[in-house]
C-alpha cells in the first residue's frame, strides 16, 4: 500500500549510461593502416571522446551498416561526394565532417589549413638553402568515384614557388596518397637521370 513517498536508489549505485557517437570513415580498415593522416585523426577524435565520456562506434563506408539507434551524432572522416552526404542525412542524426568542406551543404566541418602549413614548410626549406623544391602530390576521388578531389597543397605550393621565382611544373610528381606511391615516384624521377631538386615536399 502506498504511504506517500517514493524510494530512490542511492546516487552512488546508479551507473551513468554513456552517450554513443558514431565515426564513419571513408578509408577501409585495411587502408587506414597505410594512411597515417586519417589514422591520427581518428585516434585524436577517439581520445577526446573518451575524455568527455562518450562511447565511440566505428563504421567503414565500404561496408554496409545499420546505425545503432542510441547514437546521438555522427562524425564523418574523409572526403565524401554530395550523393554520399545525402545518404548520411537519411540517418536522421546530427552530422559533423572532418577533412571535407561541407558548410555549403549545411553541415559543420573541421578542415586543415593547408595554405599556412605548406607555406611554413616551404619557407623552412628555403631558409635551409633549398633553391629548387619539388612536390609529391596525389589525386583522390570520393569512394563512390563520383568526384575528383584536388590536392589543396598543390595550389599553395604553386603560389609560394611563383612568388619566390622558383616554380617549375616538371618538379610536381603526381601519384596517389600512399608511402609506396611516393617511393615509386621518386625512384622513377631518379632513374630519368635528370637533375633533382634540392628537396621534395
Task: Label each region the model flagged.
Residues 70-78, 151-158:
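Short, electropositive alpha-helical surface patch
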Residues 67-74, 194-198:
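Short acidic/histidine-rich motifs immediately flanking catalytic phosphotransfer sites
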Residues 62, 73-92:
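Extended catalytic core of nucleotide-activated donor transferases of GT-like folds
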Residues 5-66, 70-72:
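Amphipathic helical "hinge" segments at domain boundaries
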Residues 13, 65-66, 86-88, 192:
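Short secondary-structure boundary/capping segments
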Residues 58-60, 78, 174:
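Short loop/edge segments at beta-strand edges and connector loops
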Residues 7-9, 26-27, 39-56, 89-97, ...:
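Bacterial carbohydrate/catabolite-sensing allosteric modules
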Amino acid at each position: 500500500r502506498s504511504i506517500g513517498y517514493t524510494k530512490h536508489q542511492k546516487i552512488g549505485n546508479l551507473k551513468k549510461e554513456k552517450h554513443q557517437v558514431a565515426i564513419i570513415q571513408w578509408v577501409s580498415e585495411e587502408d587506414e593502416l597505410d594512411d597515417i593522416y586519417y589514422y591520427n585523426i581518428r585516434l585524436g577524435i577517439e581520445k577526446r571522446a573518451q575524455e568527455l565520456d562518450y562511447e565511440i562506434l566505428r563504421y567503414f563506408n565500404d561496408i554496409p551498416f545499420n546505425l545503432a539507434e542510441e547514437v546521438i551524432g555522427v562524425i564523418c572522416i574523409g572526403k565524401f561526394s554530395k550523393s554520399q552526404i545525402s545518404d548520411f542525412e537519411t540517418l536522421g542524426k546530427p552530422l559533423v565532417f572532418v577533412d571535407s568542406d561541407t558548410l555549403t551543404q549545411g553541415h559543420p566541418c573541421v578542415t586543415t589549413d593547408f595554405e599556412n602549413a605548406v607555406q611554413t614548410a616551404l619557407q623552412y626549406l628555403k631558409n635551409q638553402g633549398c633553391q629548387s623544391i619539388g612536390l609529391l602530390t596525389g589525386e583522390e576521388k570520393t569512394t563512390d568515384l563520383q568526384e575528383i578531389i584536388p590536392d589543396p597543397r598543390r595550389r599553395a605550393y604553386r603560389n609560394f614557388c611563383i612568388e619566390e621565382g622558383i616554380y617549375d611544373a616538371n618538379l610536381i610528381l603526381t601519384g596517389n596518397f600512399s608511402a609506396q606511391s611516393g617511393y615509386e615516384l621518386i625512384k622513377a624521377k631518379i632513374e630519368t637521370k635528370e637533375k633533382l631538386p634540392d628537396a621534395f615536399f
